Amino acid sequence: MAVYSVATGALAPVLSKLSALLGDEHLDLAERTRSDAMFIRSQLEAVHSLLLPRISWGMTGEEVDALCKDELMAEVRELSYDMDDAIDEFFLEEPMAGGDGGPFDELKTRVEDVSKRFSDSRRWRPPVEQHQPSLTAATVDCPPPHARFVHNMMDVSELVEMDKQHEKELIKLLEQGADTSIYASRWRIATPWHDKEQSTVVKVPEREWGFPDNRNSPFIWASDSFERLRSGSLCGDTLRLDGEGANIRKLLSTLRNKVGRAQLVQVEDKRKRVEEATKPCEFHEVKTICILGLPGAGKTTLAKLLYSHHSTTEQQFQHRAFVSLSPGANLTDTLTDILLQVGAYNDDATPYCGTGTPHQQYLIDNISAYLIGKKYLIIIDDVWHWEEWEVIRKSIPKNDLGSRIIMTTRLNSIAEKCRNDDMDAFVYETEALDYVDAWLLCDKVARKSVTCMNINPCYDIVDMCYGMPLALIRVSSALAEEIQALDSDERQIWRALRRVEDGILDIPSLKPLAESLCLGYDHLPLYLRTLLLCCSVYHWLDGGIVQRGRLVTRWIAEGFVSEEKAAEGYFDELVGRGWMKHRGLNEYEIHPMMLAILRYKSKEYNFVTCLGTGSDTCTSASLSYSSPTMAIRRLCLQRGYPMKCFSSMDVSHTRSLVILGDVIGVPLDMFKRLRVLDLEDNIGIEDSHLKKICEQLESLRLLKYLGLKGTRITKLPQEIQKLKQLEILYVRSTGIEELPWEIGELKQLRTLDVRNTRISELPSQIGELKHLRTLDVSNMWNISELPSQIGELKHLQTLDVRNTSVRELPSQIGELKHLRTLDVRNTGVRELPWQAGQISGSLHVHTDDSDEGMRLPEGVCEDLIKGIPKAELAKCSEVLSINIVDRLGSPPIGIFKVIGLHKSIPKLIKDHFNVLSSLDIRRYNKLEEDDHEFLANNMPNLQMLVLRFEAPQREPIIINRTGFQMLERFLVESRVPRITFQEGAMPKLKHLEFKFYAGPPSKDPIGITHLKSLQKVVFRCSKWYKSDNPGIKAAIDVVKKEARQHPNRPISLLITEGDKEVPNIEAHGSSENIVVVHAAPDDAISCSSCGRTSTSIQEGTVRDRIPAMDLFWPEFNSYEKAKRN
């Protein structure tokens, strides 16, 4: 599916729609219209063919940026959007313009003009391949610019003082190493500068409080901004709060939302500064340190400080090198840089005698050979690509001489991979400065610009810079004097800050900061730029908070991504690149300075127009958006923007309207081509507003997305049926109590989200939504069942019923052939209809917190169902289901379960279900011979079998070499496991499991030595009859004895009691020195120096790790050997 782009606008979708218009479905198209459409398509295809190679074939970040800003390219985008509007309106048979001419007459002329200008322009001709300049031998005699880095360091004195704590911590890592044996301990967030407990003083004009009858309101509002609010006082206009873990930014944002004005007066620490306490550890020394942080957070500064720290102590490191990379770095130059700085070119053993460009492998081999026996410090600054780092890493040999490698990066994905792939790596994450430190730094810089400060401008600047040192320094020096001159004119102060936000690249003093931030933006591929620019609607006053689900869905509605799975992947990619940081649940945050870059870029490309707090309304209203080449395509309104300005604005071409905050009175009738209307969390929206929205058919006939989450609506009006093109409807977290039957009229609906509402049942008309892909009814305890019509949703991919009162699902669920995700967590659903086996190949069922979900067993297909007589088909649901939740939790794969207690296998199962891949059956008594024969030889696909016996077994079940040829998992539940395996039995069995209660002791052999493929034996004991019961203990002893003789040593033994694993784990690898290992949660390996501990077997992974570990006691106590095995 063609998608929209920040560079080409709607060009690709328009070409796709024109092809559809000229297809067989529109054979009755008027001749003139068909002729115009063919002409326009041919002209636009020519333009697209010139653009596509440049976009697809390795354009640099700067070239893509120039492409987006190009005047002719801007005309192409605007033309494509107008063309897109015209085609959509034509499909609806409601063209906007009347007259005798064709619907595309005006656009035809514009298309012809733009196409001609494109073809005549030299700029858009196919690019000529350029070769990298060669590196001559003379390069070796003249060190490149990076080699002179140490002698040309920029003055970082402003940051040095603020980073002393981080410097001390990293120096200890360099000199002493740290514990890398524990996976989690190899990622440390920078030590905080202050302890948690603080006293915060906020000043708000008394007239603004507005709560004479309730003086507790400010304390209630403030409580969410503290981990623990201990006390507070309100005296006049001064609010004093004492507590732990204060989030100052959130506190000020909350108070400003409630009362309009709030200024921080003072923050006092009530405890001493936290002392750094890193001690050397006896496990491993850190070989590699990865410093992770946002641009401007001080990564490079820390690296420079470390490099300088050792500049006078040459005996510590024999050789040093500091190399800075860029997104498009030349690796050959980088390796040459390292070679020169460490002095390898002076070594007689590795002379360079070639001419031209040295081969990378030559450089790698020579650097490695030179450093192999030496103590070195290598710093690689600003790593962008993991592949580049791997090449550099190959040239730097590891040794035991105390050498260190330091890399800095802004990409979370690289830091994660560094820790995962290198056991000797340590990730050191530099966090933003806390509010107090940020204020101190800002105040220090501001006082250099303003000698006498009547008011302190730092509070607003600190809010905006959010702890980024470089931003604090640059913005403080740029704005302190201006804000001081404005005295207490709050509106003008906001405008000054807004100028930084909207024009960060235009202010000379902010250029170093802007360039650093733009590096990350220029590094993004085009599709990620498009998606990221959608975030420019968010504002730093609201914390830059991004709701993941809201943003992803809007991407899809806007046409930037076609599939939800792809959109989720792109979101994760942006997180991995450091643009967003996970905050909690579904919330992420973007740093205000990054938002400023996005705002600027968005304005440059005319991508999103943002109007709201701090805007100059006169300027905003008079922008040349009425120009035919610069229409408002996407509009975001934020609190504080006056509605009267709409009278001078043309929003008839606006495709998307996002409203953040309580903005009401928007004249929606002025929006003629709206596709996206996002009103989420706007508490000013009530039932009357929604009804009016639905009645404005003229304005909203193209509407695809309607977001009403968190509004005050209590019902969906009947007029909702007028939104015929609606594809996404979000009404979650509202007060609606029912879905009207008119919901069935929304034939194009793809996503329906009604979670966390008061709805008690779904109407049968839900089955008319033939294009529905996502249905979310979670968090609604009033819902107890789903209608059978749900089986008519043939394209449904996601069904979420978690946290509801649903206990069973309709059998029609098996007809949902495209269902991919079924979430039944925290419901009464324990089994699925057997018909669900039809979708076993694609469906993942979520019954617990596992991300992967459970797969369903195979065996049921459409042909099987057709072969069952109708008279018997209904009875099948009485004897067969799919078990997804066992008393012991969720199995890794569902299993077909014979419902009830039986004396023999039901006839229906034998007649129609011999093709099943699994079976779970509960019997009164022993397994009769004919049933044994059926299971062993008449179920050729059987891979998992569960036999449960109510009565004690007097004689053992004999399993011989015939039958069960495909069985891999076998579970027997009885009082005692009376079963014997003969030679050659169950040749593919890997997992054998017993669940028993109590019975007389027996030393009869079980015969597990005959199970040639066996890997694991599990004993599950009832919580009433534990493993020390004589009968159970005797059976376990028999298995232990046979395990010693099994050719597949080691065989893993796992014992559980009740619903939990017990600390009895034994892996049998020989007949000598067999002991039971007690791996209790408290048992851990402890470092005598630092006291850190490491559990030998991590919780949740014991099942996977046991088979690969030989856990004899001497080895168990050695972390190193356990890790190697």
From Swiss-Prot:
The keyword DNA-binding does not apply. Keywords: ATP-binding, Coiled coil, Leucine-rich repeat, Nucleotide-binding, Plant defense, Repeat. Residues 1-273 are annotated as: Structured coiled coil (CC) domain. SMART domains: LRR_TYP. It comes from the Eukaryota. SUPFAM superfamilies: P-loop containing nucleoside triphosphate hydrolases, RNI-like. LRR repeats lie at residues 651-673, 676-700, 701-723, 725-746, 747-769, 771-793, 794-816, 818-841, 873-898, 939-966, 989-1013. Belongs to the disease resistance NB-LRR family. This is Disease resistance protein PIK5-NP. It comes from Oryza sativa subsp. japonica.
